[in-house]
């Protein structure tokens, strides 16, 4: 049999509240061609996620309305729950409840960059920690769509300074394997120590120590 995956984006039209909202769609087909040259659909699955835009309509008294999204959305909060960082459709967002401010922290695709190059989804964003002030440490794993590491595969470690609203790259560890093998490796071991700012990460079967304080790494 043959397996096919289609990925594309659609936009709703009309006069409803959902008009002009963007959605990422993924369709999976498993097809078998019989001896009679007939094709048979063995399996089909379709998922659709709303592309979060951070507009004021996404906020209410209950919190952040992310729209159509996976139920296991990855997020981290500070201790008192006034600041939350969450990942939706390969974008990292930051919301400060006290200041009522929503910020797009990281995403290869944004309002100014929505071409084929930036929409390639062969990477994952993973939250490492969120401190009391909302400063966030996170990693980007896989293919780098744009930026100084464009075209490379690896693990980038970033630090978001909430007060300055700025993102700084702390380290980049290149990998030789593709995205899927790297994703499996990182799932086996990733650990961050807040006290000494050390990140331990497994890449291509090698365990790396990345110190975010002095921007160094060692095997």
Which functions belong to the PLM regions below?
Residues 1-19, 123-132, 136:
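Surface-exposed, charged secondary-structure patches
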């Amino acid at each position: 049999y043959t397996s096919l995956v289609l990925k594309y984006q659609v936009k709703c039209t009309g006069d409803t509240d959902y008009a002009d909202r963007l959605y990422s769609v993924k369709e999976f087909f498993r097809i078998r061609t019989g001896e009679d040259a007939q094709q048979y659909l063995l399996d089909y699955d379709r998922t659709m996620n709303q592309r979060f835009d951070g507009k004021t309509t996404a906020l209410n008294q209950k919190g952040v309305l992310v729209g159509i999204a996976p139920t296991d959305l990855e997020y981290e909060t500070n201790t008192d729950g006034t600041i939350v960082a969450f990942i939706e459709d390969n974008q990292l967002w930051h919301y400060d409840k006290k200041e009522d401010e929503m910020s797009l922290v990281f995403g290869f695709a944004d309002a100014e960059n929505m071409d084929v190059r930036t929409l390639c989804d062969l990477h994952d964003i993973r939250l490492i920690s969120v401190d009391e002030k909302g400063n966030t440490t996170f990693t980007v794993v896989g293919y780098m769509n744009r930026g100084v590491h464009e075209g490379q595969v690896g693990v980038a470690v970033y630090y978001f300074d909430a007060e300055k609203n700025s993102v700084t790259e702390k380290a980049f560890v290149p990998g030789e394997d593709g995205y899927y093998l790297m994703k499996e490796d990182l799932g086996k071991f990733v650990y961050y120590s807040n006290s000494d700012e050390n990140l331990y990460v497994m890449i291509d079967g090698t365990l790396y120590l990345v110190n975010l304080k002095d921007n160094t790494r060692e095997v």
